[in-house]
């Protein structure tokens, strides 16, 4: 029966284009990926995998649903930014390129691009994250992401961020203000002017960062680092038993939700260490956690 369908109908049944499909294709990609990954991380893995919680507070009823709902706005902002990148590419603005990627040289270059994107994304996230903790931006914008955290920065009055115990979940990843979304995702446009970047890699990489933001809030560790290319190479070279102190963990960001003036980075710890925003007990607590888990 499927063979009898006209070719046009079959094309409609095909997978969405990776890029070039406009806003609604981008938004569909993001929402399906975000909520599917969130469901697996929040509902499935804790039940089938030997995970050890790092949070000691129960989530209040409705918090997960609230975060899932609040994520829709930032997902739309990210889809709009992807659409801008598509229009830039079609008009020859920036350094993006298309076509097939084959051969050792092309694959090696794409791997180098991933490493560059990791370091640029981490730097952008660290400094914009610190900016979002500046008093006015925190009170009017970033407070949504920390809305029910147990601790507030000492220089801020507990006004709109009313103290109420909670632990973040996977769906907290993109649960933030639309202005924050525009700030956080702006680097996805900026990187298009920094070095030649394949459009397919741009889309896949920034779709993958969605998983990173969700995974940083799940409340348990599955690996001794946030999954990155650098983390994979470290695992190959050092083995699973040797934790790399320069790589971030879920606990790294979880501590930020308990101590909001600490831990602003995403993939790596070097900015926090250089700028004095690493928590004093982080390394010791992390060593104890993984020692007791082994």
Language-model segments: residues:
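Juxtamembrane helix-loop-helix connectors linking adjacent transmembrane helices
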Residues: 80-121
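Membrane-embedded alpha-helical segments that form the functional core of polytopic membrane enzymes
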Residues: 104-126, 130, 209-210, 236-243
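Hydrophobic transmembrane-helix microenvironments that flank and shape a buried ionizable site
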Residues: 71, 118-122, 126, 174-177, ...
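Hydrophobic alpha-helical transmembrane segments of multi-pass integral membrane proteins
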Residues: 28-40, 72-89, 116, 183-190
């Amino acid at each position: 029966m499927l063979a009898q369908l006209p070719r046009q109908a079959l094309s409609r049944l095909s997978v969405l284009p990776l890029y070039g499909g406009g806003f609604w294709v981008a938004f569909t990609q993001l929402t399906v990926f975000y909520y599917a990954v969130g469901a697996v991380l929040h509902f499935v893995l804790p039940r089938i995998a030997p995970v050890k919680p790092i949070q000691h507070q129960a989530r209040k009823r409705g918090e997960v649903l609230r975060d899932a709902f609040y994520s829709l706005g930032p997902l739309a902002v990210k889809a709009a930014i992807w659409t801008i990148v598509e229009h830039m590419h079609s008009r020859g603005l920036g350094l993006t390129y298309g076509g097939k990627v084959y051969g050792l040289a092309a694959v090696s270059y794409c791997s180098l691009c991933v490493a560059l994107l990791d370091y640029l994304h981490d730097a952008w996230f660290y400094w914009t994250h610190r900016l979002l903790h500046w008093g006015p931006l925190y009170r009017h914008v970033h407070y949504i992401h920390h809305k029910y955290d147990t601790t507030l920065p000492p220089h801020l009055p507990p006004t709109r961020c009313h103290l109420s115990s909670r632990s973040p979940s996977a769906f907290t990843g993109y649960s933030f203000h639309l202005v924050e979304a525009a700030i956080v995702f702006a680097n996805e446009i900026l990187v298009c002017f920094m070095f030649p970047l394949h459009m397919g890699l741009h889309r896949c990489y920034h779709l993958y960062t969605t998983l990173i933001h969700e995974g940083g809030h799940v409340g348990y560790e599955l690996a001794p680092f946030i999954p990155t290319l650098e983390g994979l190479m470290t695992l190959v070279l050092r083995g699973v038993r040797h934790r790399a102190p320069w790589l971030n963990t879920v606990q790294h960001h979880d501590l930020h939700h308990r101590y909001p003036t600490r831990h602003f980075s995403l993939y790596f710890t070097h900015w926090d260490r250089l700028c004095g925003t690493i928590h004093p007990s982080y390394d010791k607590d992390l060593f104890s956690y993984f020692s007791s888990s082994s």
